[in-house]
């Protein structure tokens, strides 16, 4: 398996896996019209190209034999979805294709985020996770994340609650 940093030429493949993994994760527990509105607004080709070109955001694919298994999106500084300190690093998205869940791929991507945080001498890694995504919450707790707040996440017309979790990044 390899982790590869993306650039704007990866936008089509990023859009494809972003939509697929978001649907696999959430479509059974949300209304289709809310899902579609979110996908249209947040995972459009134009939006993803813009995010790929933002110097304060980074995307990574995890690949095996040229197949994308999942991806990671990190935000630094002003790209963070909450107004946290500059020494925080946000995991905005970490998604794995359904067929590859339970194979430690999420842990590999999480370790990549921690490695980047260490290299940039950042203090905390943080994320928002839907309060009903129990599998993800358990994963983050198992990996040392602690709850520190909440924020709203809008999926179409549905205003949901994300739990905010953070992990102190140990210095090199």
Predicted regions and their residues:
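Short coil/turn segments at alpha/beta junctions that flank glycine-rich nucleotide-binding fingerprints
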Residues: 103, 120-123
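Extreme N-terminal starter segment of soluble prokaryotic enzymes
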Residues: 1-2
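Conserved acetyl-CoA-binding loop-helix of GNAT-fold acetyltransferases
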Residues: 102-115, 138, 142
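Active-site acidic-Proline motif in GNAT/NAT acetyltransferases
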Residues: 97-99, 103, 131-132
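Short acidic-aromatic loop segments in the C-terminal HATPase_c
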Residues: 95, 145-146
